[in-house]
Amino acid sequence: MAEVRKQQQFTRSVCVLDLGQKTYCGKVVRAVDGVYYTIKIGRTVQCGVTPTPIPKSYVLEIRECGRYRIQDGTDVLSLMITESGIEVTQNRWEEWSFEALTPVPMAVAVNVGRGSFDTEIKYVRGSGAVPPYTKNGMDRRAMPSLPGITTLDVGVRDLRLKMRENREAEREKMERALSGGLDMGSCRMYGGGRNDVREITLDEAGPSRTPRKLSVQSNESRSDDVARRHAELVEMERLRIMKNEPVRTESMWCQSDSDDQSDEDHEVGGTEPENYITEEYTRRLNEVKTKYSKELSSLAMRVPKNEGNCGKPIFSKKCKWENVPIYNYDEASGNYRFVSVGSRTHYHCCANDLSYMILPAGGSG
């Protein structure tokens, strides 16, 4: 049998300020020359007299005995204050009537001891409109007589179990009851009418369409595939440059209609220096791609040439990169030119059409 977990109750505090000193709280406070009758209720209950409200407490100002309920969101504190005593609970207490109170939060400084400190309290004022031990006008145990229904001689829990175990039979019983004397709108109002929906055959629906076969792939696996494909292409580019083989890298990285722009990038700069695409640079490209995948998701990565145009910078970041190609980059024109292999403390991410480049430029290492 599953263990029934008891709902956890948090400690709540209420400070009663009885200005008329007619209630039990006011009498106790006057006897010890205090100001507030304070109650902390949680795992234990602590009562006492304090000169100030305590931190994060409800301050209840009253002048008469009465029945007060402080309602603060999901927190409920019910107090029964008389001339001879006080009762407090955080649980349901529905057999009595209440004066419902909504607290107002206040930022205050509490002056106590040798100084003061800042805290928050919540203030409410009760008028005593509901005398102590006033019976609730509605008896929750009494069954009302309502037109159109007949009270069953079973409990609600037993009824729910029966409805759950005989779902189909109960559904048919309801449909039979609704089938006579009610129009479709009224049936739908009661939740019925489902059996009257006409089924459409395949012949009536028209010619069938061959469904496309869709492959379901998670965002995580798709991102891994893109990162792996980029890493492979960057490595291919590095090996090509080491062998000084002319290829059309633009069409490899960005499969678009920018063939003319791709040809121009390859013609600019002539012969490219060997080995300037280092393994360290390749690793850094993958790091940037992974870290800023959201910003770069719609762009394809390109490896810089000896010189060319890479467009305007999307963002510039600080870094500590060593053994990477260094470029002179003109932000106004977007032109760049390879200088040497070394270290840099800044890099630019530049975009042109549907692709981007990572240029270590600016800030010598």
UniProtKB/Swiss-Prot annotation:
This entry's Gene Ontology molecular function terms read: RNA binding
InterPro entries recorded:
BTV_NS2 (IPR007602), NS2_N (IPR037194)
Comp. bias intervals (Acidic residues): 257-266
Region (Disordered) location: 203-228, 250-273
TM helices/strands, residue ranges:
none
Q: Which UniProt keywords apply?
A: RNA-binding
Q: Look up keyword Repressor and say if it applies.
A: no
What does the record give as the function of this protein?
Single-stranded RNA-binding protein.
Q: Which family does it belong to?
A: Belongs to the orbivirus non-structural protein NS2 family.
Name the UniProt record assigns to this protein: Non-structural protein NS2
Q: What organism is this sequence from?
A: African horse sickness virus
Encoding gene (name): Segment-8
